[in-house]
Amino acid sequence: MTQSTTPAPSASVAVSKENTVNQKTKINLLDLNRKQMRELFVSMGEKPFRADQIMKWIYHYCYDDFDQMTDINKVLRAKLKEIAEIKAPEVSEEQRSADGTIKWAIKVGSQQVETVYIPEDDRATLCVSSQVGCALECKFCSTAQQGFNRNLKVSEIIGQVWRAAKIIGALKETGRRPITNVVMMGMGEPLLNLNNVIPALEIMMDDFGFGLSKRRVTVSTSGVVPALDKLADAVDVALAISLHAPTDDIRDEIVPINKKYNIEMFLDGVRRYIAKSNANQGRVTVEYVMLDHINDSTEQAHQLAECLKDTPCKINLIPWNPFPGAPYGRSSNSRIDRFSKVLMEYGFTTIVRKTRGDDIDAACGQLAGDVIDRTKRTLKKRLQGEPISVKAV
């Protein structure tokens, strides 16, 4: 085949300003979805199918070295090495739980986010972060106490999946399953980073990416309603909603974004999402953390059932996972059981989530990472004399 003499493009081709440092920076191919990858190859004078070949090497085989891609000719490999790279964030620390859960501290610049691998008998779920810290200040969540620094880039989101897949693929231990499910339930609010989360989701579900079913990719949100509508128009994935309270007065206190988008507005947005989605099979998952004598009474169970009567859903009750400095307690098993029974009497599918990885601070609500807080939230807490949680890493 005759090779094109088209000059190699500058490193800014097909990459958004957010994911480009300067004109001399190589393009990180992990920042590109398939459409962008094809645009890059066309700009190089290559056929679009070359992008598909490269994506298979990157995501099916977890290769990051162009020279290992044996069905790519040497001239194209040389071109790619000049202008591009495949660079996933590195693991700075690994912790293993007695229950098989693995938590990785992932280095992103001078900071760290956390990614969790949760193996089960019939699946293996990867919990992925979307931001360095979180801006939403949910009172029961360790991540929220660290403040917020920045959004993760596409390569830093999909790179968590790539890095985990490479590590798990290399493990020869019995029972280590490949990743079957991804949940955007790590550090950060995914809907506040849609510009990077959406391309990452597209790569997760692309046949030339990780090829996951849309029913096995879940985005969790605390209720950024306008962004929920944008997500519905952009990509179809399973949805989980962090509700955590049956009434606005309680939710205003523990999930402060409720003061802007209250429960009625949130659930209206959820029903609009369900109407557009096939991935959810007609219902969403409601996440409800169980806080002792805060939101776990029998009366509140009845209130929750009334609140959700027009929203097709299943309900996950999550025993709260403690972290240092938190002002809450975990609901007792008896209170959780009573709460669950009330919901089931109303006909709701209700599951009490099994706690995984709490011995390594990898359970729901415990992820902390290492965040340089741009919101000055921790400073404000010190000045006000409020308790401050200790980082898990």
UniProtKB/Swiss-Prot annotation:
Disulfide cross-links: 127-364
Transmembrane region(s): none
Chain residues that bind S-adenosyl-L-methionine: 188-189, 220, 242-244, 321
Enzyme Commission number(s) from the entry: 2.1.1.192
Pfam families, A to Z: Radical_SAM, RlmN_N
Family: Belongs to the radical SAM superfamily. RlmN family.
Protein name, as recorded: Dual-specificity RNA methyltransferase RlmN
The encoding gene: rlmN
